[in-house]
């Protein structure tokens, strides 16, 4: 029996590394009856963490997609189908989070009640804002020392700039944490310890909490009143709102991203997770609540597809995974229409047809074969050849390209070589497969040294790639020292003439161009403008000039690093009836760009990372001194229950081995996170040293 679309919820559970997200997901699977034994992360048995490295490191790397059903704590709803995408919280895997947010309709963000809003949480929050994903918050670990629910609520307001609406208050905290108060029903909920919180009872609110509950309930009513004029009138006249009115208003305000409902509990102690599941159903959108999906047709015109079974089929591939039993799995989100196994689909980004063999629905690590996938659902297809992350699959007669995801360029590179010569080919295959799964990871061969270079988003990212090569493909590799991905750019505008002329018996070569080369704002990238008028250079040679410039940009002008953020205008030149060719113009363009760029004040850019260190106060001086030595610029400091938080921008080149140094300087008590921030000009002495090395 197919579930109607309004009973679907596609959600992600997102959080900072240790906020307890995987445990929360485990409880969800347990209470919805999908798994019979609770898998604890610290036993290395969590159902969602199915790669061996994840179980060893206790962090989630691949987002597995799982389907479960829920009909409410009091069985008050029809059975809803919830598709959960488990997202990693580690910054080196931010790309996975971004990718899963793209295909979700809503998210549950888990915060640790002790640590509060951590740097990663801010990143996840920003990405959810970018994709307009409605969310609810679960403040977890209320049973831990130092748990403070209301502090987390105020951080959501201040650090994340959102409007939290508290729907529950905790009864007690730390080891005194007993249950939660439902502020809409105005009842306390207590879960039974014997059956891991499977059953619960409503009891009266403890007398000492009544006043606080009244105060927070008033905030809910105030927020709900914003929803409609009728409610506003009721509110101003001091009338009571019904439970249904409050929930309808909050649902609308959550889906339009005006408020964020906040729940609390302890997943580990089996308290509060079912109430969050009710929140998913009551406040997060179904596929029909979200705006139509936008895309472009083959002519580049904008088109819309409704979430409906009657529309032509369209879907977005958001993850490729290699499965030891069935080979390549392509996870995709269907936005419109119906796809049956055996159908042929069109990959509109690559312009290729693919036949769909088997379709699978995933439950963390077990799989069920299905006959069809309908709009709004998430499934995996087996054995698609040409599909990569971000591709659109659609009906070949009704072509649509849903938006491409933008993936950041890698900031760190290392050389790898197999430990034995015999593994050379195996290593190539392994790296190719891993690169297909992960668009933020790149592989290439250095033409000069012949070495294989892998690039990624951070040291941990590349460590895990090397580790997976060993486990999944049986290839052991030696890893070189990390190299920084520098860039070059220009600081001055210049006009330059470039001529490539060869006259030797027979046909010669002739290409002649004038280029205006100018810097762009950081991050704008490369732009080529054809300003040729009157056919002084024939149309067919112009793409060759562009190509020549781009090839030269890839090879750099001062130190061999790619040139970024320049605008080049081709405004004049000449050609020869017989001797001109695409090749001649490509070489002319390339030489002209190099000569011009050398006069346009070229500079070296280095990647700058945003670093956030949390340290006990006693080590504050050492941490600050060390960041200064690493050419760091401190951006700000604040107090937190875990100690002082220092935010700084530090060049990536200075951050290698930082975790070891920080550990020894603070006896292992400080922690840090780091993510790419921007490219900035390297100081002259540093730039000179790098140029010399080249």
Curated annotation (Swiss-Prot):
Coiled coil: none
InterPro entries per UniProt: EFG_II, EFG_III, EFG_III/V, EFG_IV, EFG_V, EFG_V-like, EFTu-like_2, G_TR_CS
One of the record's GO molecular function terms: translation elongation factor activity
Matches recorded under PROSITE patterns: G_TR_1, G_TR_2
Presence of keyword Protease: no
All residue ranges annotated as the tr-type G domain in the record: 6-288
Top-level lineage group: Bacteria
Biological-process GO terms, alphabetical: ribosome disassembly
Residues that, per the record, bind GTP: 15-22, 86-90, 140-143
Keywords: Cytoplasm, Elongation factor, GTP-binding, Nucleotide-binding, Protein biosynthesis
Main subcellular localisation: cytoplasm
Pfam family, one: EFG_IV
Example of a GO cellular component annotation carried by this entry: cytoplasm
Disulfide bonding pattern of the chain: none
Subcellular location: Cytoplasm
PANTHER family in the record: RIBOSOME-RELEASING FACTOR 2, MITOCHONDRIAL, TRANSLATION ELONGATION FACTOR G-RELATED
Record-stated family: Belongs to the TRAFAC class translation factor GTPase superfamily. Classic translation factor GTPase family. EF-G/EF-2 subfamily.
Function: Catalyzes the GTP-dependent ribosomal translocation step during translation elongation. During this step, the ribosome changes from the pre-translocational (PRE) to the post-translocational (POST) state as the newly formed A-site-bound peptidyl-tRNA and P-site-bound deacylated tRNA move to the P and E sites, respectively. Catalyzes the coordinated movement of the two tRNA molecules, the mRNA and conformational changes in the ribosome.
Name of the protein this chain belongs to: Elongation factor G
